[in-house]
Amino acid sequence: MVISNTTNSIATFIPHSRPTLGDEEVRAVEAVIKSGYIAEGEAVKQFEQAFAEKFGVEQAVAVSSGTAALHLALLAMGIGPEHEVIFPSFVCSALLHAVHYVGAQPVPAEIDPLTYNIDPDDVQKRITARTGAIIVPHMFGLAADLDRLLKLDVPILEDCAQAVGGKRRLLQRDDMFGSDLL
């Protein structure tokens, strides 16, 4: 979305977030592009290994986008056309696309106006017999209220794209797909 700046008549983006990339990141991307391997190759293997080591997991798999990651996770959870998937109304369109890709019915829920995370009270009102999952992004690095969401007894898919490396507390649960703010 753009707004018009009447002072000097230039279009300006509404501030949301800006990338913070430095020369080191630019050089790394340039090296990958010049290698001829932008989808696979040594850089991707190194990234996957470093990511897995950083978070103490056996494997990490790089995919082409957040949409692809969510799509694969929903498939792994067995979500399909017979399901509804609850997700926050204020979120990147990748969630909605992933839900559509598996044929499930998207069900938007309200957000907490202070954290921009999904509102557990509103989620509870939207649960039906067809609810197969709740997608829970941790917005702007703020952890969503998983304690309350877990009590709803619906499988949860955490979207940690905005909270990589964040800490909440370690949970070992069979009804969660994803990890603790990885």
Q: What would you call each of these model-derived segments?
A:
Residues Y37-E84, L95-V102, V107-E110:
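Phosphate-binding glycine-rich loop
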Residues M1-Y37, E42:
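N-terminal "arm"/small-domain region of PLP-dependent enzymes with the aminotransferase-like
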Residues A69, V91, D119:
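Conserved SAM-binding loop
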Residues D112-L181:
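Active-site phosphate-binding strand-loop segment of PLP-dependent enzymes
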Residues V29, F51, A69, V85, ...:
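Generic structural signal for small/hydrophobic residues in well-ordered secondary structure
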